[in-house]
Regions:
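C-terminal output helix
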Residues: 1-4, 44
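Long hydrophobic alpha-helical segments typical of transmembrane helices together
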Residues: 69-73, 77
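…primarily DNA-binding HTH/wHTH and HhH modules…
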Residues: 78-83
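Recognition helix of helix-turn-helix DNA-binding domains
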Residues: 35-70
Length: 83
């Protein structure tokens, strides 16, 4: 019975991998949620627009989302902006 419980626990870990956003990705998500464009984000963070786009792609890939509303939902449900 203990082995079965361990197997179920291990499957849950695989089914729900931990999503870790970098500090910079968290900054960008917050600005995206605030409605800033890539250009506005790049100006605010003193980075290029292409760097912002790279971070956005990584954020969407990590969260397995493809739209801002889905990203906002994932961020809220998984508490991804916690420090």
């Amino acid at each position: 019975e203990a082995e079965m419980a361990l197997n179920q626990f291990q499957r849950k870990i695989i089914d729900y991998p931990q999503i870790i956003l970098t500090a910079r990705e968290k900054q960008i998500v917050k600005l995206m949620i605030d409605g800033l464009t890539n250009k506005e984000i790049s100006n605010a963070l003193f980075i290029s627009e292409s760097t912002v786009e790279t971070h956005r792609k990584n954020i969407y890939r990590k969260t397995e989302t493809h739209s801002l509303p889905k990203l906002i939902q994932a961020v809220a449900n998984l508490n991804l902006l916690a420090d």
